[in-house]
Regions:
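PAPS-dependent sulfotransferase catalytic domain
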Residues: 82-152
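PAPS-dependent sulfotransferase catalytic core
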Residues: 1-75
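Phenylalanine-focused residue identity feature
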Residues: 6, 23, 29, 36, ...
Length: 152
């Protein structure tokens, strides 16, 4: 069975938004921008690098299961391209991602930090998402993250 949700796991200040807009032009896709952001903001204590967090929390669902349900419902009608931030995935072993096609987008760290520091001074590895992206990569590469038939 073809996986119908394509989940781009990126960090801020990458080309992820441009990539999302390119998928939005394809008639077979519906595009969702950072669907787990509301859930993430509800869970983290330091929101200093999220200047519009109150507005985002009012506008977006806080419940991870509701977000997953919405994406899977959309996937019944069309292919789904979800532009997600790696650090918005707060679980150690996000098994729900195993049913989706996941793409990890990584920008050269030096360029990423330089770009991000123009917006947020002294960015941390957590804020730029690179640490979480690596953790997700490790999860996908472990036996519990691998699924029979998905790998050689």
């Amino acid at each position: 069975m073809m996986k119908r949700i394509f989940n781009l796991l990126s960090g801020p200040r990458n080309i992820s938004t441009a990539l999302m807009y390119s998928f939005a032009q394809h008639p077979d896709f519906v595009v969702v921008d950072e669907p787990f952001y509301g859930h993430y903001l509800r869970q983290v204590s330091d929101r200093s690098s999220h200047p519009m967090d109150e507005e985002i929390q009012k506008a977006m669902p806080h419940n991870k299961d509701q977000v997953i349900e919405r994406l899977e419902k959309l996937a019944q009608e069309k292919l789904v391209f979800s532009k997600s931030m790696a650090h918005h995935c707060i679980e150690e072993e996000p098994r729900y991602l195993l049913d989706w096609t996941n793409i990890i987008l990584i920008r050269h760290p030096k360029k990423l930090i330089h770009s991000f520091s123009k917006v947020i001074p002294d960015p941390t590895l957590e804020a730029i998402g690179i640490k979480k992206a690596f953790g997700l990569y490790q999860f996908f590469e472990t036996p519990q993250g691998a699924r029979t038939g998905d790998r050689e």
